[in-house]
UniProtKB/Swiss-Prot annotation:
This is 4-hydroxy-tetrahydrodipicolinate synthase. The gene is dapA. The lineage of its organism: Bacteria, Pseudomonadati, Bacteroidota, Cytophagia, Cytophagales. One of its GO terms (biological process) is diaminopimelate biosynthetic process. Belongs to the DapA family. The active site is at Y135, K163. GO terms for cellular component: cytosol. It comes from Cytophaga hutchinsonii (strain ATCC 33406 / DSM 1761 / CIP 103989 / NBRC 15051 / NCIMB 9469 / D465). InterPro entries: Aldolase_TIM (IPR013785), DapA (IPR005263), DapA-like (IPR002220), Schiff_base-form_aldolases_AS (IPR020625). Keywords: Amino-acid biosynthesis, Cytoplasm, Diaminopimelate biosynthesis, Lyase, Lysine biosynthesis, Schiff base.
Length: 297
């Protein structure tokens, strides 16, 4: 199995004005990211608007990603949900040829107990043909995968790590401290990636790296190599932009920035709506500052 160290971009799904998938823009986005030095790509994650893409679109997006990638970097594919049997069925019907790992979000809305979360992931791992990365994002799911549960998951065959986006550095440290080295903790929060790596995490799955793949990758590499002064200097450039990515929902912000950069349109599917004029203005201002700082370093 490929080791998922460094930066993984949680790829957006570009849409045309009619809200159909813009596969050409998707190809360009992938090439932009890989050629800029990201370590792996994530297809059909939360940032990809997976809640509002069809089964056929998901399969086509994966096919396109694998074709463009052509084996250059590892590929992670997202399949998750709050119906364990249905998630297993979707895993069984998916084509994993060329896929290196599965990213699966914690069950949301029905708020299972910690034992239920554990049994959900155990059942998925037993049926999945590739290694599984659990995903803790309580801000979206309404439930936190506790450190104790993550530690239990580290003992399950075929679960190789957790994408930790609880925002709790103490929880991340507890997981890192009490799991084997081969159980990977990956930051799911762009602004907490550097401090989480300082505790022993191995990288980040990032939203911002869609737009600044070279600089974000440089930051993560510096942190992994314990060059924290350099990593923090780069991180400081993103502190104004990052909250704007979420101000009106993800990927609304990052798609607005990608449109500003000429990479794809900012179209999203309902119930998400495009960014307000006020937010677009703030994103433009923050982008000007970042590009100016790039030019000066």
């Amino acid at each position: 199995m490929h080791t998922f160290y460094g930066t993984g971009t949680a790829l957006i799904t570009p849409f045309k004005k009619d809200h159909s998938v813009d596969y050409d823009a998707f190809k360009n986005l992938i090439e932009f990211n890989i050629s800029s030095g990201v370590d792996y790509i994530v297809v059909n994650g939360t940032t990809a608007e997976s809640a509002t893409t069809s089964k056929e679109e998901k399969a086509k997006l994966l096919e396109v990603a694998l074709d463009v990638n052509n084996g250059r970097v590892p590929v992670m594919y997202g399949i998750g949900g709050n119906d364990t049997a249905e998630v297993i069925q979707r895993i069984g019907s998916a084509d994993f040829k060329g896929v290196d790992a599965l990213l699966s979000v914690c069950p949301y809305y029905n708020k299972p107990s910690q034992e239920g979360v554990f049994q959900h992931y155990k059942a998925i791992a037993e049926k999945c043909p590739v290694p599984v990365l659990a995903y803790n994002v309580p801000g979206r799911t309404g439930i936190n995968i506790s450190a104790k549960t993550s530690i239990r998951l580290s003992e399950v065959k075929n679960i190789f790590g957790i994408k930790e986006a609880s925002g709790d550095l103490v929880q991340a440290l507890e997981i890192i401290k009490n799991t084997p080295n081969e159980f990977l903790v990956i930051s799911g929060d762009d602004l907490l990636a550097v401090p989480t790596i300082s505790l022993g995490a191995v990288g980040a799955i990032s939203v911002l790296s869609n737009t600044y793949p070279a600089k974000f990758s440089e930051m993560i590499k510096a942190a992994i190599q314990s060059r924290f002064q350099q990593a923090t200097q780069i991180l400081a450039r993103f502190t104004e932009m990052n909250p704007l990515m979420y101000e009106e929902g993800n990927p609304v912000g990052v798609k607005s920035l990608l449109e500003l950069m000429g990479i794809c349109s900012s179209e999203v599917r309902l119930p998400l709506v495009k960014a307000s004029g006020e937010l677009i203005h703030k994103i433009e201002q923050a982008h000007v500052k970042i590009t100016r700082e790039y030019a000066n370093h």
